[in-house]
Amino acid sequence: MNKIKALLLLLVAFIALPTLAQQLPTLPVDKDVRIGKLPNGLTYYIRHNNLPENRANFYIAQKVGAVQEEESQRGLAHFLEHMCFNGTNNFPGDALTKFCERIGVKFGQNLNAYTSTDETVYNIDDVPVTESNVDSCLLILHDW
């Protein structure tokens, strides 16, 4: 009888254990990160980095992944991720990849995306900082 009680107590402890992980304090936000919200609801984070010099990285994370899909929609978020590289409103056909490669951003290495269970993230990394390049990369993020 004592073994059953001990086993039951152990089982309850293991079931309750994950709730402790939920009580961890939130991570502090880097004081150098500028955070804002656009009228359309998009939250943005901007941080200056000295290295690599005169280079910028652009990311857009969308709360879209397998968890939000219905059974009839399985794989849709991942499919749309791939389609974004096949042309957008402002970069039809392969113009997006051609633009990026022309400025030294390599497809697959510096220009990429992934879809997980709860997010889809697109990135353009190691972009040479010029007004034109920054404007074009922001336009790409807009299209995605």
Language model features with spans:
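Bacterial N-terminal signal peptides that target proteins for export
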Residues: 1-8
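Short, functionally important structural connectors and interaction interfaces within domains
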Residues: 7, 25, 30, 83, ...
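Bacterial N-terminal signal peptides
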Residues: 8-18
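Hydrophobic/aromatic side chains embedded in well-ordered alpha-helices
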Residues: 12, 34, 72-75
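Mature N-terminal segment immediately following signal peptide/propeptide cleavage
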Residues: 26-60
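Active-site-adjacent, His/Asp/Glu-enriched structural segments that form or flank metal-binding
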Residues: 62-77, 81-144
